[in-house]
Amino acid sequence: MPSADPAAPGNKRGRSIVLFQDATFLAICDWRNALNCSLPNSRIVPVALASLLLATGCTGTRIAELLRSETPHERYVERLQQVGLDQTALGGDWIEASIRVLEEAVEVRAPYEEVSYLDPSAAHARGYRLSLKRGQRLTTSFELKGDTTYQVFLDLFLKRDSTSHPILVSSADSLSNTLDYVIRRSGEYILRIQPELLRGGQYVVTVKTFATLAFPVSGRDTTAIQSVFGDSRDGGRRDHHGVDIFAPRGTPVVAAARGAITSTRDNRLGGKVIWLRDDLGRRHYYAHLDARLVTRGRTVEAGDTIGLVGNTGNARTTRPHLHFGIYERGVGPSDPYPALYQPPTDAGGFQGDPAVIGSLVRVSRSDARLRGRPSDGGQPEAELPLYTQMRVEGGTGNWYRVRLPDGTHGYVVASATESADQPVETTVAAAEAPLLSGPTGGALETARVVRGEELPVYGRFGTYLYVATPRGQLGWLPF
């Protein structure tokens, strides 16, 4: 099918040379091993300042202070430092948890809703990993249950690679309840949730994605797209830099976003075309129009009719359609589909028992599996023997998000678990032995069991039993 791509060979208007791509992000790193990075909001970085950034690297806070405001999480870390709490065991654990969770984040897919719990007596954070596309809008809502007098910090990071620290791209706290961000670079993102030190409780987090553009052909949606971004053109010599939306001649073409009409010139490939620059700086390209109904300089709102579907330009031998493209400074053409597609938004709610969130449970049947995400599809992470003990950290749909005693985390279907508040059997100590804080060889001894003592068993993990002594002490006993 013919292409109206303005960046095709011979069409110089679509080409540009830029010093910095917005995808580079010019991250300014934070005080601790480049953990927290941020993006300048400005689209233009003065050359002198850019040279300074390149010369100094991602090293200090002085440059960061020039370019951006601190996030709520960073301000809280500074307060901990000012009073010396970062040097305490608990304060250090809190900071380490904020770093560690970026590697331990569980994979989720929007729409996603989870009921979760953060233990106020421990230094914890939660992480959720999502794959997102340029042009999508990510909206995260957060609701505390019970006490709402403390802050919970929400931070969104872009994961670069296995050796680089993720880049902080957006932040909020529970006072605003919502984190809203338009994705400017496709990739893996990590949502971190962390409460103030010694605060916590149950919360509900909801993650959804939305289109950022109205569909540009009236009465149609993405099912009318019949040629997609990246399709081969001219025998493989170039790619299709847009999507083709088919509709009868004369169907209204509407503005996909609020913006200014910047050009209404004809060109050889697109025939009658319109260029629109939206409020995010994206340039929209509408081609093969039968007629234009706007003029250069006019400001339009999303949904305003700006033209009519046709087949002018190099589409004159094909059925009428709109070629729609998006171009961004420093990026060039980008796939419009994620910005146009409106995905489902119903997360389905939580069908498990909210009372067990934050509590210990155990496997109640022999076919239980630990999975990397809340779905029966894919290879299970591990087989879970009967009575395996775990702590429920959250719930979504009919799944519990759990952490095993060795720190492994994942999802277990709720119906394969039961409360661990009653013993499943009783064992008798064959000899005096240590009662341990965990089911590992390096765990601390917390008590001793005496030979001949009857010990109720509440769960298992590996070669250890979770037992209670006659004196009410709980711990792990090798068997």
Ranges and model annotations:
Residues A55-G57:
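C-terminal motif of bacterial Sec signal peptides marking the signal peptidase cleavage site
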Residues T59-I63, E70, E74-R75, L118-L175, ...:
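Acidic, Ser/Thr/Pro-rich low-complexity intrinsically disordered segments
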Residues G60-R109, Y128, L156-D161, Y181, ...:
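C-terminal edge strands of extracellular/lumenal beta-sandwich accessory domains
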Residues V106-T139, H240, Q379-E381, L386-R391:
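Non-catalytic, beta-strand-enriched accessory regions in extracellular/secretory proteins
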Residues R184-K272, A302, N311, L322, ...:
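Surface-exposed, glycine-biased beta-strand/turn segments
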Residues I190, A382-V413, A447-P478:
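SH3/SH3-like beta-barrel superfamily modules
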Residues V207, L340-Q342, G348, D353, ...:
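Boundary regions of SH3-family modules and the immediately adjacent low-complexity/disordered segments
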Residues T264, L280-G303:
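Short histidine-centered loop motifs in beta-beta connectors
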